[in-house]
């Protein structure tokens, strides 16, 4: 594993490369730096978009605006969960249905049921054995665990946030529909994916397939959110 030191990356020379796109018949220039035999392309574009995302998330946190993280990759589950919990935001995974984004009233009833069952099994369980059959208690418990597993990251959500961070989604349909519903979308995206780019409000240019790249970007975003939250203390 290569340790990336930002000071070293800043101080090494800048190179300008070129490539010919035969399909589109055009000549493309690109900027890159070479560090430990690794090439970093379009470094200024990456920093430009990352700094904009930092500022936006700082302002969100400063004014106590909630953020919802949507994740479609199992390998990023712990990253998303940690980032949401450390910054008092919400998260959910794509392998569960996310229809609630378009039908909040119906989904809110599920959150009410989740809170009710949690209180039931947290505070009143010892009293329930005197009044409810054992089989019914077990059935209710399985319902509770199932809802908690799916929506535990949304348990304390009072209203649906307008700012949504999407991680590892390649569905243009999702981006387009969220955009039509006036959600503000933040996402790590490949700069060459023009269909997705046009539906993202705050773009973070990067490799959204690499766990290490996502983790590096998340550390910066975590700093931005914590930085903004300090304003109110």
Swiss-Prot record:
Tagged with keyword Amino-acid biosynthesis: no
InterPro entries cross-referenced by the UniProt entry: Ribosomal_uS2, Ribosomal_uS2_bac/mit/plastid, Ribosomal_uS2_flav_dom_sf
Entry-linked Pfam families: Ribosomal_S2
BP terms from Gene Ontology: translation
Gene Ontology MF: a single term: structural constituent of ribosome
Location of this chain's protein in the cell: Plastid, Apicoplast
Keywords: Apicoplast, Plastid, Ribonucleoprotein, Ribosomal protein
Keyword DNA repair: no
GO cellular component: apicoplast; small ribosomal subunit
Similarity comment text for this entry: Belongs to the universal ribosomal protein uS2 family.
Protein name: Small ribosomal subunit protein uS2c
Domain of life, per lineage: Eukaryota
């Amino acid at each position: 594993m290569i340790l990336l030191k930002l000071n070293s990356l800043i101080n090494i020379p800048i190179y300008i490369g070129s490539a010919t796109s035969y399909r589109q018949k055009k000549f493309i220039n690109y900027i890159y730096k070479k560090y430990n035999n690794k090439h970093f392309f379009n470094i200024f574009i990456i920093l430009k978009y990352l700094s904009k995302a930092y500022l936006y998330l700082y302002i969100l946190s400063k004014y106590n605006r909630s953020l919802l993280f949507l994740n479609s990759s199992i390998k990023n589950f712990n990253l998303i969960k940690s980032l949401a919990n450390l910054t008092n935001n919400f998260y959910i995974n794509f392998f569960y249905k996310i229809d609630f984004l378009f039908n909040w009233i119906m989904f809110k009833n599920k959150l009410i049921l989740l809170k009710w069952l949690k209180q039931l099994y947290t505070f009143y369980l010892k009293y329930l054995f005197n009044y409810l059959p054992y089989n019914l208690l077990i059935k209710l418990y399985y319902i509770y665990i199932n809802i908690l597993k799916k929506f535990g990251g949304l348990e304390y959500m009072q209203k649906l946030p307008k700012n949504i961070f999407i991680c590892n989604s390649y569905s243009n349909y999702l981006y387009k529909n969220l955009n039509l519903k006036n959600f503000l979308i933040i996402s790590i995206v490949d700069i060459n994916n023009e269909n997705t780019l046009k539906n993202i409000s705050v773009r973070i240019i990067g490799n959204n397939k690499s766990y290490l790249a996502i983790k590096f970007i998340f550390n910066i975003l975590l700093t931005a959110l914590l930085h903004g939250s300090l304003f109110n203390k």
